[in-house]
Amino acid sequence: MGEWILMLNQLQMTTDGQIRDKVEIAVQRLRSFEPPDGYYVAFSGGKDSQCVYHLCKMANVKFDAHYAVTSVDPPELVRFIKANYPDVKFERQHYTDGKPITMWSLIAEHTLPPTRKVRYCCASLKEPGGRAVSW
């Protein structure tokens, strides 16, 4: 995690100031639009999620970061998130009977694995997370 802060600080020291300006604009926007309950940050562990996470930290806004467990998550990714972002909440979706929704249960329901053209897994495993925001 420290590497990201170092990289952001190095980017802010660019002579042309373009990246510094973009970071500052992002920080100001996060502050300007901060919801009363804070932000719900969907966190995948990827570079974009890490960037948003660190921008939220820099802006000093209230936020919770959430990782949607799919049951086919790479162990290296899970270890990385737990080691570097210990405050990220791991969330799993459940059926109405309380059983966890897994990739394997979805394949059985749909009678085929997800494909490039048939993508049902995100709708069941990732998109239900979050909370409604009213403007």
Residue ranges of model-derived segments:
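ATP-dependent adenylation/nucleotidyltransferase module used to activate substrates
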Residues: 2-135
